[in-house]
Amino acid sequence: MAKMQAKVQADERDDGLREKMISVNRVTKVVKGGRILGFAALTVVGDGDGRVGMGKGKAKEVPVAVQKAMEQARRNMFKVPLKNGTLQHEVHGKHGASMVLLAPAKDGTGVIAGGPMRAVFDVMGVQNVVAKSHGSTNPYNLVRATLDGLRKQSTPGDIAAKRGKSVEDILG
């Protein structure tokens, strides 16, 4: 079975959302009469201000699969608390055999991340971050692991509320 990896394509919609297609794979279903060919697309969507979502779509034609994936990504968006264009703190994410380490970076560092992780940070609007992946490099698992890590982000206000202290006490 042939596998097609598409280049990451970016799009800006009229609703202000940034869209990136991460991969398109040709998939087959073997039935009694032969093989049924189809396509699976993986996409991420973000608003450039901390909101991000991922979607996966399957169809007989590539454009239909990509459209389904984009719609699913829009439905699955969530907000990530950012601090000056980077992350709040270092965090680990995991999905399946993929593990990622996401760390904030100083201004001017840029996005140091591989393939699918870079697409997630681009649509989110993160300008400075260091990310390292371990284990499986499957694009779907890497995106899910990255989103898992981003969901674990917490603001100083969240931590202060959990501990019953003020934000000033937490920040020192």
Swiss-Prot record:
The lineage of its organism: Bacteria, Pseudomonadati, Pseudomonadota, Betaproteobacteria, Burkholderiales. The keyword Acetylation does not apply. SUPFAM superfamilies: dsRNA-binding domain-like (SSF54768), Ribosomal protein S5 domain 2-like (SSF54211). Part of the 30S ribosomal subunit. Contacts proteins S4 and S8. InterPro entries: Ribosomal_Su5_D2-typ_SF (IPR020568), Ribosomal_uS5 (IPR000851), Ribosomal_uS5_bac-type (IPR005712), Ribosomal_uS5_C (IPR005324), Ribosomal_uS5_N (IPR013810), Ribosomal_uS5_N_CS (IPR018192), Ribsml_uS5_D2-typ_fold_subgr (IPR014721). One of its GO terms (molecular function) is rRNA binding. PANTHER family: MITOCHONDRIAL RIBOSOMAL PROTEIN S5 (PTHR48277:SF1). GO terms for biological process: translation. It comes from the Bacteria. This is Small ribosomal subunit protein uS5. With S4 and S12 plays an important role in translational accuracy. Located at the back of the 30S subunit body where it stabilizes the conformation of the head with respect to the body. Keywords: Ribonucleoprotein, Ribosomal protein, RNA-binding, rRNA-binding. The gene is rpsE. Residues 17-80 form the S5 DRBM domain. Belongs to the universal ribosomal protein uS5 family. The N-terminal domain interacts with the head of the 30S subunit; the C-terminal domain interacts with the body and contacts protein S4. The interaction surface between S4 and S5 is involved in control of translational fidelity. GO terms for cellular component: small ribosomal subunit. Coiled coil: none annotated. The keyword Protein transport does not apply. PROSITE patterns: RIBOSOMAL_S5 (PS00585), S5_DSRBD (PS50881).
